[in-house]
């Protein structure tokens, strides 16, 4: 399974790159708004340090606006993927952009039928939001299972990006289900590398080593 990092923060991206954990980057308007600088400058810098796909989201909600923005975004770098919201106009935009060879990531997916429609429209990626589904006391990972089964049944090329990842268990379950990608916030990525027994083991080894030095 590939790891994308869900951030627009350059320092977080560089830190994850140093761990060898960045197969791609996803951003959204909320993440971009947290960073200093112009939108296109931030995206351009991310694309310059990351070899894999970099998702940048349109702001417009109408078909014409989304297509225009998407074409402009695609000119920034070859590894740009345009994020399009899961709406009727969004699906129309995805169809047009796919025919033009522009890669797309349909975002804000909350049902298997939405994911099916995204795939039929030709989306490169589909992003179901598991954490937000869990917030409603529903099972976000069950949605990933449904989408994975549908895509397998009909051999869609669309890849599943598990989004709205809140904890390491989301990542583990995504891998067990067979999702293509999980897009992970930096803090969750760091948590994946941690375990209480690892910490205890290190403390024990260091304590034993100090005893040897003091002999």
From Swiss-Prot:
GO terms for cellular component: cytoplasm. Signal peptide: none annotated. It catalyses: D-sedoheptulose 7-phosphate + D-glyceraldehyde 3-phosphate = D-erythrose 4-phosphate + beta-D-fructose 6-phosphate. InterPro entries: Aldolase_TIM, TAL/FSA, Transaldolase_3B, Transaldolase_3B/F6P_aldolase, Transaldolase_AS, TSA/FSA_arc/bac. The active site is at 83 (schiff-base intermediate with substrate). It is found in: Cytoplasm. One of its GO terms (biological process) is carbohydrate metabolic process. Its EC number is 2.2.1.2. Pathway: Carbohydrate degradation; pentose phosphate pathway; D-glyceraldehyde 3-phosphate and beta-D-fructose 6-phosphate from D-ribose 5-phosphate and D-xylulose 5-phosphate (non-oxidative stage): step 2/3. Transaldolase is important for the balance of metabolites in the pentose-phosphate pathway. Belongs to the transaldolase family. Type 3B subfamily. This is Probable transaldolase. It comes from Desulforapulum autotrophicum (strain ATCC 43914 / DSM 3382 / VKM B-1955 / HRM2) (Desulfobacterium autotrophicum).
């Amino acid at each position: 399974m590939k790891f994308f990092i869900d951030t627009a923060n350059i320092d977080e991206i560089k830190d994850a790159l140093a761990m060898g954990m960045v197969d791609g980057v996803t951003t959204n308007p909320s993440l971009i708004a947290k960073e200093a600088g112009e939108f296109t400058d931030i995206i351009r810098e991310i694309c310059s340090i990351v070899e894999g796909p970099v998702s940048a989201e349109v702001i417009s909600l109408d078909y014409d606006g989304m297509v225009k923005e998407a074409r402009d975004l695609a000119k920034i770098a070859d590894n740009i993927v345009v994020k399009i919201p899961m709406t009727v106009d969004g699906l129309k935009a995805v169809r047009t952009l796919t025919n033009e060879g522009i890669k797309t990531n349909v975002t804000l997916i909350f049902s298997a039928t939405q994911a099916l429609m995204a795939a039929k429209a030709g989306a490169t990626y589909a992003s179901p939001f598991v954490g937000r589904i869990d917030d409603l006391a529903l099972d976000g990972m069950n949605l990933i299972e449904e989408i994975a089964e549908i895509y397998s049944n009909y051999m869609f090329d669309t890849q599943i990006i598990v989004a709205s990842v809140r904890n390491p268990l989301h990542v583990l379950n995504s891998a067990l289900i067979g999702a293509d990608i999980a897009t992970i916030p930096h803090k969750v990525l760091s948590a994946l590398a941690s375990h209480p027994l690892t910490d205890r083991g290190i403390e024990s080894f260091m304590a034993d080593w100090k005893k040897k030095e003091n002999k």
